[in-house]
């Protein structure tokens, strides 16, 4: 893709959404940072643009045309043929834009993405941005990993039927003869739904309706390093025609915490593993499947069976590989840097030396709103992965000040309400978590 820095933030008014005045080439997905050798480019903070073209065949007329971004760090404004079609804040989860009425069929269309990597105390992860005497901006993270930025995951152009499957969720129960899968399907139309479960090419269970139960005899269970996946097929029918078909791979398993032990399918499992990062040399945090595969092989070699997605939700492909490899995941929302002592140190003693909790500031309501949005998006995306066994809601936050309970409680309640499988909710504590 074409790429250009926009340090004066003049691109929107100057018409850069239609054509960049000058540009470099930039691979996607990738962070831009480590692709440069000069310090100013590597540590650039502010607006920057991507530009490319895509073709929409005439045969797609009558379908909904949707652009889906795996992640853009940290803020994105998306333009198609110069028209703004989406805005998104949050650098670690997907978002989409419906462009059905914007695209031109049977010809090329211009896609432009304005990205911003500045940090603030109302965003996840937290930080601040300073402006130097020469006008340059510099990011001051409250977190201890590099502030990589760019289009980090794949971008998809999709043609979708007008009536389609929007979402589904599952819950599992083991029985004496196998397993039962309670499901819920949401669609955007009135036509009937069928749900089938396949083991290879053999159909092993079926049901109908947007809610129901699949009864699986002699079910093969998903387990640590012994993953077994079934194909779940959801269809919408209009008479004899299939309006939409959605396929996903699921694993049958149960989990609970009892007497201080984690039980998977009723048997205790000791969690051994890591808090990881997606970072790698050259491409930064951009998705790179060979590196992902190598990381999984290293974890197996060392005897691990679990990892925490420190400190943000990872690319969907990593969860799919964990499903296939039989790894357990503690899925973490990017709530990191919520420590006032860190904020004071890195942001030039905010609060003028007064002892102040991180969650008792004027920025707290906006932060909590963004935190809830990120948590909702993470659970919506990852709730059907058999590998995901817990939600991590914060990493090393200040947890002893007056506003802590008021901030934490709605997050834990929200996670409980959103997750049909009622996974454990957790957060990581730092021993120095005082103001």
PLM features: residue spans?
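Short acidic/polar inter-strand loop motif in beta-rich domains
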Residues: 116-123, 238-243, 266
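Extended acidic/polar, glycine-enriched regions
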Residues: 104-108, 184-258
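Active-site-adjacent substrate/metal-binding segments within catalytic domains
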Residues: 32-56, 60-68, 73-89, 154, ...
